[in-house]
Swiss-Prot record:
GO biological process: chaperone cofactor-dependent protein refolding
Chief subcellular location: cytoplasm
Role noted for this protein: Together with the chaperonin GroEL, plays an essential role in assisting protein folding. The GroEL-GroES system forms a nano-cage that allows encapsulation of the non-native substrate proteins and provides a physical environment optimized to promote and accelerate protein folding. GroES binds to the apical surface of the GroEL ring, thereby capping the opening of the GroEL channel.
Pfam families xrefs: Cpn10 (PF00166)
Any one GO molecular function term: protein folding chaperone
Family indicated by similarity: Belongs to the GroES chaperonin family.
Record localization: Cytoplasm
Assembly and oligomerization: Heptamer of 7 subunits arranged in a ring. Interacts with the chaperonin GroEL.
Swiss-Prot/TrEMBL keywords: Chaperone, Cytoplasm
Name of the protein in question: Co-chaperonin GroES
């Protein structure tokens, strides 16, 4: 199934969670925090301004982004977990 985000929304796939600490301790699933980093899979056409013009998004498909831990809505597509979020939930683009 494909999904096309609307307006200023993005479809983001979280980066893989860490399985071990730097010291080699295996982290159980119950203690793992959801990563706040991901890759943008799809972007909407942009936000509509007050004047009626569409404003393009700064984030592009393929960008690695840092986002708020509590931002976005979890969705499951074809057995994979994704987030749908607004561009405002993105804290920065990683380079």
């Amino acid at each position: 199934m494909k999904i096309r985000p609307l307006n200023d929304r993005l479809l983001v796939k979280r980066l893989a969670e860490e399985e071990k600490t730097a010291g080699g301790i295996i982290i159980p699933d119950s203690a793992k925090e959801k990563p706040a980093e991901g890759q943008v899979v799809a972007v909407g056409p942009g936000k509509v301004s007050d004047s009626g013009e569409r404003v393009a998004l700064q984030v592009k498909e393929g960008d690695l982004v840092l986002f708020s831990k509590y931002g976005g809505t979890d969705v499951k597509l074809d057995g994979e977990d994704f987030l749908i979020m607004r561009e405002d939930d993105i804290l920065g683009i990683m380079e």
